């Protein structure tokens, strides 16, 4: 048992109650990605059960993401908002929009940010080979996020679903960070097999961070762990991509990393609270 005098923040999670799970698992491209995670898969859990699991492992707040890819809505903003309404102290929302209809997308971002959502989520792989994160397709969204002062989480690294990985090369974020120095950018999913490139960007740019979603601690690349523990502990956010990574592994495997306690607190809580403008932790948790 480990007692922490702070609550953990999960920077990328998703609701997975049955209708969402059915939608997700019925998509062959997504089902392939689900299979890569082994026994957990995606789904079928009530939001109440999700909160119980958070309690058991000391997770105070999770950023719940809507998932919109092209014409396909896997998790709607309304579904995320319903979860937040049930547990307003435990969840915040992340926005996802189709950039091909820019005016509609900008209005949606404004609406959901006004409703309390704290993040904009971008997965460029849903828009083919020709729209990486530095494509002009995304620039209106970046400008709106700057205006609203919300961070943007951008998927980096290979894709689990059968969709293009090219847009996940972290170097594309270099141009975005230079063009929008006011924009807080989070490179999600570590960036493997280009994790050193992602680390370089987080080290170089004051406005660039990394999150660990979709990776259990036992699968963190060795050089990434050194980056976290020694070089830039203030630039990495803990995340799971829940339910793909459940908390028994996402938290249960942390001890093997042998992180300095001050680094662990930054990683598990303080960095995310800063980036997402969350309240300070007022709870102690035992897990």
Outline where the language-model segments fall.
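Divalent metal-coordination and catalytic microenvironments
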Residues: 12, 54, 62, 80, ...
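Short, well-structured secondary-structure segments
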Residues: 53-54, 58-72, 79-83, 88-97
């Amino acid at each position: 048992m480990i007692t922490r005098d702070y609550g953990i923040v999960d920077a990328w999670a998703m609701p997975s109650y049955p209708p969402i799970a059915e939608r997700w698992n019925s998509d062959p491209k997504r089902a392939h990605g689900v299979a890569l995670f082994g026994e957990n898969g995606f789904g079928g859990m009530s939001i109440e059960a999700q909160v119980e699991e958070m309690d058991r492992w000391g997770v105070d707040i999770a950023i719940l993401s809507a998932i919109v890819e092209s014409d396909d809505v896997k998790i709607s903003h309304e579904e995320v908002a319903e979860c937040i309404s049930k547990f307003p102290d435990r969840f915040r929302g992340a926005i996802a929009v189709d950039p091909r209809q820019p005016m509609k997308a900008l209005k949606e971002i404004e609406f959901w940010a006004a409703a309390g959502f704290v993040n904009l989520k971008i997965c460029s792989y849903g828009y083919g080979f020709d729209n990486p994160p530095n494509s002009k397709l995304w620039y209106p969204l970046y400008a709106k996020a700057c205006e609203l002062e919300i961070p943007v989480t951008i998927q980096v690294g290979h894709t689990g679903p059968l969709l293009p990985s090219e847009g996940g090369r972290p170097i594309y974020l270099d141009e975005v960070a230079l063009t929008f120095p006011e924009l807080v950018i989070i490179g999600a999913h570590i960036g493997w097999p280009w994790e050193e490139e992602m680390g370089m960007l987080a080290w170089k740019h004051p406005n660039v961070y990394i999150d660990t979603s979709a990776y259990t601690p036992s699968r963190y690349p060795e050089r990434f762990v050194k980056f976290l523990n020694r070089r830039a502990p203030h630039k990495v956010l803990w995340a799971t991509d829940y339910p793909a990574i459940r908390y028994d592994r996402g938290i249960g495997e942390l001890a093997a990393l042998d992180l300095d306690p001050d680094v662990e607190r930054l990683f598990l809580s303080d960095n995310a609270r800063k980036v997402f403008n969350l309240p300070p932790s007022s709870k102690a948790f035992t897990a």
